[in-house]
Amino acid sequence: MADVALKRGPGRGRFVTFEGGEGAGKSTQIKMLAARLESEGMRVVLTREPGGSPGAEIMRHLVLSGMGKLLGAEAETLLFAAARDDHVRNVILPALSQGSWVLCDRFFDSTRAYQGSLGKVAPDVLNAMQRVTIGDLKPDLTLILDVPVEVGLKRAAARRGAGAPDRFEAEDIKFHKGLRDAFHKIADDDPKRCVLIDATAGPDPVSLLVWDAVRERLFTAVAAAS
């Protein structure tokens, strides 16, 4: 890079997570950021939760099919925890240790928003699961994409076409408004890690906001050589 230098420890990659409600545009923005980073010479690993590793993808199917909901909020949270444990051990940590940037579509903030704030799973239960599954691992940066609920649900419906909504898309409007509030609170509670991004506009304008946040938080400007 000609004009920026990475803020980083020796040898370790960077861990960036994308969060937000349904239809916020996370999948699009994570791909656009990956392309930008690769153009700057970075090695990038794209992944997602629930899922991201073979074992975790099995859990993803169980959760999004609605089977987890039948077991109750705490049992569903255990499914997420099992998936995350497999994902962290087999994908995220190895990639970071090799110096790659890991861009993850959802991580533990989604568990806190969906199962904690809305599913009413107690904070001490979530904290215990977090200690077991991720230990000291924490994203270097979390980008929370924010859109009005009606906009997000309309996008989600357009994306799936004639397909049936998944477990969370099928929830009522009150659920989704509560979800948006939960992500706002996460951003407010941890401003050093989280950046709330207005994702109402199209992909290109939003990608500029994403890149600005990455540059500001994970890179530092250096004087151009004269």
Swiss-Prot record:
Pfam families: Thymidylate_kin. The keyword Coiled coil does not apply. Transmembrane segments: none annotated. One of its GO terms (molecular function) is ATP binding. One of its GO terms (biological process) is dTDP biosynthetic process. PROSITE patterns: THYMIDYLATE_KINASE. Phosphorylation of dTMP to form dTDP in both de novo and salvage pathways of dTTP synthesis. This is Thymidylate kinase. The gene is tmk.
